[in-house]
Amino acid sequence: MAKRIIYNENARRALEKGIDILCEAVAVTLGPKGRNVVLEKKFGAPQIINDGVTIAKEIELEDHIENTGVALIRQAASKTNDAAGDGTTTATVLAHAMVKAGLRNVAAGANAITLKKGIDKASDFLVSKIKEMAKPIADSNAIAQVGTISAGNDEEVGKMIADAMDKVGKEGVISLEEGKSMETELEVTEGMRFDKGYISPYFATDTERMEAVLDEPYILLTDKKIGLVQDLVPVLEQIARTGKPLLIIAEDIEKEALATLVVNRLRGVLNVAAVKAPGFGDRRKAMLEDMAVLTNGQLITEDAGLKLENAKLEMLGTARRITINKDTTTIVAEGNEAAVGARCEQIKKQMDETDSTYDKEKLQERLAKLAGGVAVVKVGAATETEMKDKKLRLEDAINATKAAVEEGIVPGGGTTLAHLAPALEQWAASSLSGEELIGANIVAAALTAPLMRIAENAGANGAVVAENVKARAGAEGFNAASGEYVDMLAAGIVDPAKVTRSGLQNAASIAGMVLTTECIVADLPEKKEAAPAGGGMGGGDFDY
């Protein structure tokens, strides 16, 4: 296919145009008074959402070069989402501000490579400062505050996530389900999560989120490698007759067997997914036995004289729901309390008997996975559109609270970044010189961008608010919901340090890449052939 090649300033300006379009669409959602965005869908009802990364993923522009700019900033948002699960809008606004200021300097003759070095050094300095400022989470009240802010100031959501964390522990699993009523409810049930995702992405049932969700599935547990699909055929035929989905958890699945499963899944013959068993050696077997107890099934192992080809339906485990993504598998089971309790007692006995610290640690891990259970939040809403929006907000809130537990909290509402701007300017003036100093100052100027946007979305003057906040000490910032200047920590307006840090690092990384671009190679738009004239109507000049 023919390519179009654009150089120098033209290339950077085209990228900038795409970045402007994406940033404007995403930035309207920022802050407590941020608005929603409606996404038109080819099939089904339109979606109304308030989540930066979801909006960014939907934007595709006609111009290939501008679309490249969109894709670059989208990457900053999705990387922040992968790392921290929230803060995607902040990352987008920061990257946009850095790119705008940086391009002005490059156009004025600054060396892009040296600017990038300055940006990277400034980013490293700020990351260390954010870590210093972070305060560890003290109680469930702080968890509720983080959840509330992340869910768009929804206190009910914040409180529910704090309750869920109380019940399943800070390391526990919180899963989301679509509820049947108008109310959002919390339920704690047996279940576990382990760090293995699907073997093939073709098993995903939701291609937008790249997740496989199986409702009321059968679970086949085996500690052997599945090499031939013939071994599976008898059990697959039995399951196909029931019409229920199947999850296979095995040591591994060879290519031939995997290909057969994928083909059956794509043709709709059988809704199946496969996951590698977690752990190694004896520990893997023990974890598979834990899963068998949890799901009321049997581990098919040759040690017990069981073979795959002789497996019956009653040997398989069952669960209420299983969610699998590329990295993790979450099993939500129910109705097995007695068996799970007995298994937990057995693990505790083993812990008492062993002298090895390593073994004790691993047994403790297994116990926590099995006994902790899963908190299921059933999302309630009046309409499907509201349900989808609420689900995205809840997901952000859960991710934000987990990030806060990991790395602590900092004052929210763009306050932390705005307060760091003067500190960065001082450090850069004493430690850097020339164009590196200009690069660091580009970052310093961009740090107030999220705060300004939050203020503007609330109807205030962004530049005035930013100057006022920079002049204040400690954790004082602008509460956009009330329009007052308050102590953000005392008012419960907090952000997870991990979210702020990830957003900043990804924005600086993308900005550096855009500034150092000197040439773009993109596909030429395809010329569409004119449609042939209608039968018997000739190709005249008239519109019939």
Curated annotation (Swiss-Prot):
This is Chaperonin GroEL 2. InterPro entries: Chaperonin_Cpn60_CS (IPR018370), Cpn60/GroEL (IPR001844), Cpn60/GroEL/TCP-1 (IPR002423), GroEL-like_apical_dom_sf (IPR027409), GROEL-like_equatorial_sf (IPR027413), TCP-1-like_intermed_sf (IPR027410). It is found in: Cytoplasm. PANTHER family: 60 KDA HEAT SHOCK PROTEIN, MITOCHONDRIAL (PTHR45633). Its EC number is 5.6.1.7. It comes from Synechococcus sp. (strain CC9605). GO terms for cellular component: cytoplasm. GO terms for molecular function: ATP binding; ATP-dependent protein folding chaperone; isomerase activity; unfolded protein binding. Coiled coil: none annotated.
